[in-house]
Amino acid sequence: MPPRTPSTPSTPKPPRVAVLADSDTRWKWGALTAGRVLPGSPVLDGFLLRGRATPTPRQLREVGARADSLREVTAVEFLRVMARESYDVLVLALVGGGVQAVLHGLGRVWEGRGERPVVVTGYVGVVYEKLADGLLLRHGADLVLANSRQDAERFRAVYEGVGADASAVTEVALPFLGGAPYAGEHTPYTVVFAAQPSVPESREGRAYLLERLVRHARLHPEREVLLKLRSKPGEHTTHIEELPYQKLAQKLVAPPNFRLVYGNMGEVLDRTDLMVTVSSTAALESLHRRIPTVVLTDLGVREALGNHHFVGSGCLASWDQLDAGHRPAPDEEWVARQGVAAGGAAGAGAGGGSYATAFDAARERIAELLAAPALPPLNPYYTPTTAPGYLPGILARHHLGPDGGPLPGAPAADKEPGPVRQIVRRAARGAYRHGVQRVAPVIRRMGEL
C-alpha cells in the first residue's frame, strides 16, 4: 500500500478519506462525519456496499451529502481497493455485522503494514436496541464514535464489562445537526410527523398513527399537516419497510391541509412548528433547533418502539393531548446529555454553542494517530477464538472466510461488472424489495388465517 497522502509545509495536501456505507442514512452519517472530524476540505471517495438497502440515485440526491467519487462495491471488491489505494481515514458507516466483516478483511489486507488509514465507525442515530451486540461488532476500529455523553458512558461500560479495550470510544454528536434555530410560528402553523420504516411494524399500529394524523388535520384546518416519508415505494432505507404509509394512505379521504412530503429533513424542519414522531432521530434534529417536539405514547412507551429512549425528555405525549393544543417543553438536562443542547446560535438554550466543539476530541485523536510513525494492527474483540460459533457466519455473509480472506467463489473484483450483470443485479434487488413490501405481508396474513 502506498504511503498516506504526502504533503510538504509549502504544499499541504487535503486529507484523503474513504467512506463505506450500506444505506442512504448511513451514507449521510458517514460522509458528514468525515467532514466533521477532518480539517479543511478532505477528498472524499464514497463506496456503497451492494445489498438490499443500496440507495437509489434519488435517495442520494435527497440526502445531500457529496463525494468526489462514488461507486457501488461488494465487501471483497472494497477490500481490494483498500489493499492498493492510500487513504488517511476510513469511515465504516455500516450495520454492525458489516463493520466486523470489513475489520477482519482489512486486518488481512493490511497485515504487516504499520502505515494504514485511521478507521472510524459509529451509529447513525439513537441506540435503543442490541447495545452489546452492535458495540462488540464495531470493536476493533480506532475510533468508535458515541453521539452523546450518555452513549459514551454506555459504550465504555459494555467494552470494559467484557474485558475489551474501551479507549476507542470517543464522544461526538450527530453530524447532521444544524440549521437555523426556531424563531416562532409560521403561517400556516405546520405539524410534521416523521415516519419510520419499521416503527411500528404492525399494520394496525401504522394505520392508527396515520388515522390520528389525518384526524388532527381535520380538527385543525388552519394548520398544515405533513407526513414526512423516508422513501418511495420500491426503495429501501436502513430498516425494511413492509407497509409503506403511501399504500395505507390510498384508502383514506384526507382533508386538503394534509400532504405527504419527501425531501431533505433539514429543509422540512425549516418550516416546522411541531415535530411529531414515535422515535425517529428527527426528534433530536428538531430538539437541537428548539422546535417543539413530541414523542408519541399512543402505542405505549416500549423498547420495541424505541421511544423508551426519550423517558425523562419532557417530550412524551399522545395525540389526544396534541389535539387539545398541548405543546411539550423539553427537559434541558436530558437534552444536554443527548448532545443536542445547542440551540443554533451561541448562548441559545442549554449549552448554547457547544455543538461547535462537539467533534474536537475526535479531531484531536485522529490527528494523533495520523502523526504516529505506525499504527498497530486492527484488534477486534471477536476472533475465531472468542466467538468461534458466531464470527464465521458474520464473515461468510460478505464472502469472507475465518481468516478475513475471500471465500472460494467470491465475486471477482478485478473489473467493473458488464451491462448484463448490472441489469441482473438491479432486477434482483427490485424483486427483493417487491417481495418485502408486497408478497411477504400477504404470506404472513395467510398464515394468520
Where are these regions (language model features)?
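Active-site and donor-binding regions of nucleotide-sugar-utilizing enzymes
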Residues: 15-45, 50-165
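Conserved catalytic-core segment of nucleotide-activated headgroup transferases in glycan assembly
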Residues: 29, 177-245
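Conserved active-site histidine-acidic residue motif and adjacent donor-binding/catalytic loop
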Residues: 72-75, 259-267
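Nucleotide-activated donor-binding/catalytic signature segment of Leloir-type glycosyltransferases, i.e.
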Residues: 241-263
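Nucleotide-sugar donor-binding patch of glycosyltransferase catalytic domains
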Residues: 292-344
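C-terminal amphipathic helix plus adjacent low-complexity
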Residues: 323-449
